[in-house]
Amino acid sequence: MPGGLAVSTVFATAGFADLPGVFSDWITSLDMAPMLILICILLGYAVLGMFMDAIGMLLLTLPVVYPAVMALNGGEAVSAAEATFGMSGPMCAIWFGILVVKMAEFCLITPPIGLNCFVVAGVRPDISVQDVFKGVTPFFIADGVTIGLLVAFPGIVLFLPRLVG
């Protein structure tokens, strides 16, 4: 119970201190290309995913990172013509959400935590964890390429949402 109270206090304090707003202001004031900042954020997720559970990582970071990415794009109500990433605010939210979920999936097979690999090794006692990590290497590479494509060509992600309207 004291641990839960401590965590609640930290989150309440961070919310009252406007941590997402401060982080967004800091990110947008950097003298870097917005796409480079996005890549740094995704690399940060990859590093965090090596040591944290994916859901915990998302719950702790998204309230701070999402407003920063939206600010980089030009805001929630920006039109596609004025946006940094070339898409309107709602489309950018969909794109970033899919990128983050894909990063969470990527982190589930990333050593040393790689939760999915440990689950497979636990279900199949005849296979060692090292063999499982060797076996997921092609998937690790494919996920990296997929994330790269989703960053480079956001139209892949937004094809169906644009058809709907």
Predicted regions and their residues:
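Alpha-helical transmembrane segments of multi-pass membrane transport proteins
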Residues: 1-165
